[in-house]
A protein has these predicted regions:
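Extended, histidine- and acidic-residue-enriched regions that form the cofactor-binding/catalytic faces
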Residues: 136
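Short peripheral tails and domain-boundary helices/loops at the edges of structured domains
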Residues: 143-167
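A contiguous, surface-exposed recognition patch within enzymatic or periplasmic domains that forms
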Residues: 1-121, 139-143, 161
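Short, hydrophobic/aromatic-enriched beta-strand segments in well-ordered soluble domains
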Residues: 120-133
């Protein structure tokens, strides 16, 4: 479902799928990166920072039927056009002795890979919207645009929310 091999597998307490929604913990405390192919991605992603009452929504161009995207894994490529359209990077210390670059996290999108003739072009649009407001107003936006409510976003990585399947 998700490519989490960029910096090694992402632990379960930082990456979770629930009801067709992928949750990735972007707190700048653990170096990791995930990606989605165009077959699995949607044209909208988001993040929520409850400490600042800030909802970030990214809407981007995701052309139908296009599957060739540059493979950005840091290795020699067997399939250089089998890449991800959507990535999220979470900064953090790479090891116990090296400080992080930030800390920060990113929501990234890519245009399709295209062998363009001279003077030819393609267009890729990436729009980032930052919404600040009351929890009720932001919750309405999150439900409408992301299909998930803020209480779910806030609770998904709580220890109690990661119980066994029988709970």
């Amino acid at each position: 479902i998700v490519n989490d091999a960029y910096f090694g597998a992402v632990p379960d307490d930082r990456l979770l799928t629930q009801d067709n929604t992928l949750f990735f913990k972007g707190d700048g405390q653990y170096r990791s990166k995930i990606g989605l192919t165009p077959k699995r991605a949607t044209p909208v992603i988001g993040s929520y920072d409850p400490s600042r009452n800030l909802l970030t929504v990214v809407h981007y161009t995701l052309p139908d039927g296009i599957t060739d995207y540059v493979n950005s894994m840091w290795e020699l490529q067997d399939a250089p056009y089998a890449g991800d359209v959507l990535n999220s990077y979470n900064d953090g210390p790479p090891d116990a002795t090296t400080p992080p670059l930030g800390p920060f996290y990113e929501l990234e999108t890519s245009s399709p890979a295209a062998a363009l003739s001279p003077n030819a072009s393609i267009t890729h649009v990436h729009r980032t919207f930052h919404f600040e407001g009351s929890s009720n107003d932001l919750n309405a936006i999150a439900q409408t645009v992301l299909g998930v409510d803020l209480p779910t976003i806030q609770s998904v990585f709580n220890t109690s929310a990661l119980g066994s399947e029988s709970e």
